[in-house]
C-alpha cells in the first residue's frame, strides 16, 4: 500500500512538472515569436527593385516609392531617417509617397519635416494622403484621429513635398515629360478622379498616386499607366497557405508587389512603418521602380 502511494505521488509530480514545463515552453515560444515580430522584423528593411516598361517607351526614370510611414509611438523618426537613407542610396530621379504619414494624432511635426526634407533635397518629391492623415474615417476611428488633414498638409509643405490631392501636374525628368496625378483617400470619401484627371493631356505617360489599391475600380475609365499604392502594409502578417487575411482591402489579390493589368501597372508597397509595432513574414519595404 505504501509503495502504491509513493508511486502515485511520484507519477503525479512528474506529470505536473511535465505539464508546467510544456506550458512554460509554449509561453517561451510565443514570447520569442512576439519579440521577433516586434523587435526584429518590424525594423528589418527590405529593398526591392522592379522594372516597369510603359506602353510609351522612353528614358528610364528611377522612382523611389515609399508608403505608410506611420510616424507614431512605435515608429520613430530615427527609424524613418534610416529608411530614407536606404532609399536615397539607390539614387532616385523621382520620389513618390502614397500616404499615411502619421498613425493618429501627432506632435513632432517640426522634427518630422526636417527628416522628410532629406527626400525633397535629393529629388522632386510628391505625395497623396492616406486614411490616417485626417478626414471622416480618421476622426471616427476610436476618436483618436482628426477630422482635418491640415497638420499633414502643413508638414508636407514645410518639407517641400508637393501634395497632389485630386490634382495633377507635369514633371520633366531625364528629358522626359510625365503626368503625375494624385487622388484623395478612398476611406475618407475624398477620392475624386474626375477632378484629378480634368484637362489632363494623356499623350504623356501618367503615374497615379492613390493610397488604397481598392480605388483602382474608380480609376478604370481614366488614363493612367502606373498606379502607386500602399495602405495594405503587405498584410503586415503574412501566413503560409493563407496569405494576408488581415489586409484592409476588399480585393485580396492585390496586397503587395507589382501587377500588370492589361497595358497598365499597379505597384503596392508593403510600407515602411506599421501599426502596433509588429510584422510577420512581411518585412517593411523601400522600393525602386525603373520606369521606362
Model-derived segments and spans:
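Active-site-proximal beta-strand elements of phosphoester/diester hydrolases
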Residues: 60-70, 177-185, 207-210, 265-271
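Core catalytic region of metal-dependent phosphoesterases/phosphodiesterases
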Residues: 78-172
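Conserved beta-sheet core of the metallophosphoesterase superfamily
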Residues: 213-287
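N-terminal secretory signal peptides and thylakoid transit peptides that target proteins
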Residues: 3-26
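N-terminal active-site segment of His-dependent metallophosphoesterases
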Residues: 24, 28-113
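Binuclear metal-dependent hydrolase catalytic cores centered on His/Asp/Glu-rich metal-binding motifs
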Residues: 137-161, 165-168, 173-210, 216-217, ...
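Active-site neighborhood of phospho(di)ester-bond hydrolases with catalytic His/Asp-centered motifs
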Residues: 66-67, 95-99, 125-131, 164-166, ...
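Beta-strand-turn-beta hairpins that frame and shape the catalytic cleft
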Residues: 54-63, 161, 169-180, 260-265
Amino acid at each position: 500500500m505504501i509503495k502504491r502511494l509513493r508511486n502515485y505521488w511520484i507519477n503525479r509530480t512528474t506529470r505536473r512538472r511535465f505539464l508546467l514545463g510544456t506550458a512554460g515552453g509554449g509561453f517561451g515560444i510565443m514570447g520569442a515569436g512576439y519579440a521577433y515580430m516586434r523587435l526584429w522584423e518590424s525594423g528589418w528593411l527590405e529593398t526591392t527593385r522592379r522594372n516597369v516598361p510603359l506602353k510609351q517607351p522612353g528614358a528610364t526614370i528611377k522612382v523611389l516609392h515609399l508608403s505608410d510611414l506611420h510616424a507614431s509611438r512605435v515608429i520613430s523618426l530615427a527609424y524613418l531617417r534610416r529608411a530614407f537613407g536606404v532609399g536615397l542610396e539607390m539614387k532616385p530621379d523621382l520620389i513618390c509617397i502614397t500616404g499615411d504619414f502619421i498613425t493618429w494624432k501627432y506632435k513632432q511635426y517640426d522634427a518630422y519635416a526636417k527628416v522628410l526634407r532629406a527626400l525633397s533635397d535629393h529629388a522632386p518629391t510628391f505625395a497623396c494622403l492616406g486614411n490616417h492623415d485626417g478626414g471622416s474615417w480618421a476622426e471616427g476611428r476610436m476618436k483618436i484621429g482628426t477630422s482635418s488633414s491640415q497638420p499633414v498638409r502643413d508638414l508636407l509643405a514645410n518639407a517641400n513635398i508637393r501634395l497632389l490631392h485630386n490634382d495633377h501636374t507635369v514633371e520633366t525628368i531625364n528629358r522626359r515629360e510625365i503626368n503625375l496625378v494624385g487622388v484623395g483617400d478612398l476611406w475618407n470619401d475624398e477620392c475624386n478622379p474626375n477632378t484629378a484627371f480634368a484637362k489632363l493631356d494623356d499623350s504623356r505617360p501618367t503615374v497615379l498616386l492613390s493610397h488604397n489599391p481598392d480605388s483602382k475600380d474608380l480609376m478604370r475609365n481614366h488614363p493612367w499607366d502606373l498606379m502607386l499604392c500602399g495602405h495594405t502594409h503587405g498584410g503586415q502578417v503574412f501566413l503560409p497557405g493563407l496569405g494576408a487575411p488581415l489586409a484592409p482591402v476588399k480585393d485580396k489579390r492585390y496586397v503587395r508587389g507589382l501587377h500588370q493589368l492589361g497595358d497598365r501597372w499597379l505597384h503596392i508597397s508593403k510600407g515602411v512603418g506599421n501599426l502596433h509595432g509588429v510584422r510577420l513574414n512581411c518585412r517593411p519595404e523601400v522600393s525602386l521602380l525603373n520606369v521606362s
